[in-house]
Design a protein with these regions (language model features):
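N-terminal pre-domain segments of enzymes
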Residues: 27-126, 149-155, 462-472
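N-terminal cap/lid segment of alpha/beta-hydrolase-fold proteins
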Residues: 129-196
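Cap/lid segment of the alpha/beta-hydrolase catalytic domain
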Residues: 195-280, 314-324
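Short glycine-enriched nucleophile-adjacent loop
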Residues: 265, 292-303
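Alpha/beta-hydrolase fold nucleophile elbow
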Residues: 278-289
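Mobile cap/lid helix-loop segments that gate and shape the active-site cleft of serine hydrolases
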Residues: 307-364, 391-418
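C-terminal catalytic histidine-bearing segment of alpha/beta-hydrolase fold enzymes
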Residues: 340, 393, 400-471
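Conserved strand-to-loop "acid loop" that flanks and positions the catalytic carboxylate
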Residues: 369-390, 436-438
Length: 472
């Protein structure tokens, strides 16, 4: 069967997602004596950003502009000089409690230090998931007994095997704010001839790998991030964040889009736990670029994910905030990307600096421990380069610095402090790394990832190492 062209797959994707976007049933009239919630506010991203600065008492003029990654002639062009890349070389002490007690045992990590790190990320970086997030109810259409031509996630092309495609929608209870509907869109593709429950790789945004996963006998799940939360600041009074806030602007510690997308992945995993065709103990999470950031956040916060493929996540993902290279904290605190983060994160692009953050990316990676986590990038330079914006070296440094947490929990880290050249993989441990020569994609690393991940997804299921920290 011929491979599906990318344009055809995209059109099919749009058709499927549109078919899943039916509004939830209209809520009935409010009970006698209860006041209806106010209408959701309509704001531009700039207006919403300014409201957050007002709450933080930060003048807009005090927010530092981020570097320019496109124009080398710009006065604020990104730094690519390694001599200037580490103005704050000292990272937060990952294995030291707030009370200055060294963390020398797994028990102390699980009981004390890990919860401390989670609290820092909640309060200062990604924001808090509300305690009263509405319930999600999953609905499914009859399975599509199609072959590869009915595939999904077009970069995978023709999987070459018969498949079962399930189109699902997770309807979020909006009875408290009927003006906002959230319908989480998920497409699950399974090998039709599987002898029993199969592992599944869940991917944010359809980043590819479907063909390789299905060829291995695994399933592939496409999760639509924008069906959970829009990827812009103007959407913060809608989506799951807006629904929880009844259409009103965020408070400083409220969650941003990265945390909301990760929450949506957990709710999709809730569904997979009910599907008898899926081995829910062997579900991985993956994403590329901003969705690579989301995949790392999901992996860090949701211990039910068995393995992670973190693609080109850069600043806000696997890259050290304290590195002065490529994209910076100041890019994430500007009005174009602030919606990914908690409002409180804006402080670190204004009156505070990245060195004032109580945590850094090495600790986000450490929250994934002891589970296998593969960090993927394209090469910074040379033929087929991804470029320098994502700071490959800063992410490698973070992975190296996360290694002690993996070793503390009895697992192997990268095994070296020297970043290997492109197309040389570090895959001997539960922390893995590879750069390819194929640009801004995970595609050329998928085969290496699958061979590495099979060591974990093909073995006995392991119980989660800790209870899920976010509410249903």
């Amino acid at each position: 069967m011929s491979a599906i062209r990318w344009g055809q797959a995209v059109r099919f994707t749009v058709f499927v997602l549109a078919s899943l976007s039916l509004p939830a049933a209209a809520a009935g009239p409010t009970s006698q004596g209860s006041a209806a919630p106010p209408a959701p506010m309509t704001l531009t991203a700039r207006q919403d950003w300014q409201l957050m600065l007002d709450q933080l008492k930060i003048p807009a003029a005090q927010v530092r502009p981020g570097p320019n990654g496109m124009n080398p002639r710009a006065p604020n062009y990104q730094n690519t000089d390694e001599a200037k890349a580490n103005p704050w070389p000292h990272l937060p002490e990952m294995l030291m409690t707030k009370g200055r007690q060294p963390v020398t045992t797994p028990d102390l990590w699980w009981a004390v230090r890990r919860p401390e790190i989670v609290e820092y990320f909640d309060a200062e970086v990604y924001g808090r998931v509300p305690k009263d997030v509405p319930k999600v109810t999953w609905e499914t259409a009859p399975p599509d007994q199609g072959g590869a031509r009915r595939g999904f996630g077009g970069r995978g092309g023709d999987p070459g095997v018969p498949t079962v495609v399930k189109r699902l929608v997770g309807r979020v209870d909006n009875s408290a704010c009927p003006a906002i509907s959230v319908n989480i869109q998920l497409v699950l593709i399974l090998p039709a001839k599987a002898a029993g429950p199969v592992p599944v790789m869940m991917d944010f945004g359809g980043g590819g790998g479907m063909r390789q996963y299905l060829a291995r006998g695994w399933g592939y799940a496409f999760l639509s991030p924008n069906s959970i939360q829009a990827d812009n600041g103007a959407g913060l009074t809608r989506g799951i964040i807006g629904l929880c806030n009844k259409g009103q602007p965020r408070k400083p510690e409220d969650w941003g889009a990265l945390r909301a997308w990760a929450w949506g992945a957990s709710r999709a995993l809730d569904y997979l736990e009910t599907d008898k065709a899926v081995d829910a103990k062997r579900v991985g999470i993956s994403g590329l670029s901003r969705f690579g950031k989301a995949a790392l956040v999901a992996m860090a916060y949701e211990p039910r994910f068995a393995v992670g493929l973190i693609g080109s996540s850069g600043e806000g993902g696997a890259k050290l905030h304290r590195r002065n290279w490529g994209e910076q904290v100041e890019n994430l605190t500007g009005s174009g990307e602030y919606h990914w983060m908690a409002g409180s994160f804006l402080k670190y692009g204004g009156p505070l600096a990245p060195c004032d953050l109580p945590v850094d990316a090495h600790e986000l990676i450490a929250l994934c421990a002891p589970r296998p986590t593969f960090i993927s990038y394209g090469a910074p330079s040379g033929p087929g380069a991804e470029g320098t914006w994502v700071d490959q070296k800063g992410s490698f440094m973070a992975a190296v610095a996360a290694g002690p947490a993996y070793r503390l929990l009895g697992k192997k880290d990268l095994g070296t402090t020297v970043m290997p050249p492109p197309e040389s993989a570090l895959v001997d441990g539960e922390l893995a790394w590879r750069m390819h020569k194929g640009g801004h994609t995970t595609g050329p690393n998928i085969d290496t990832f699958v061979a590495w991940a099979a060591r974990y997804l093909a073995g006995p299921s392991a119980a989660p190492a800790a209870p899920s920290p976010h509410p249903k």
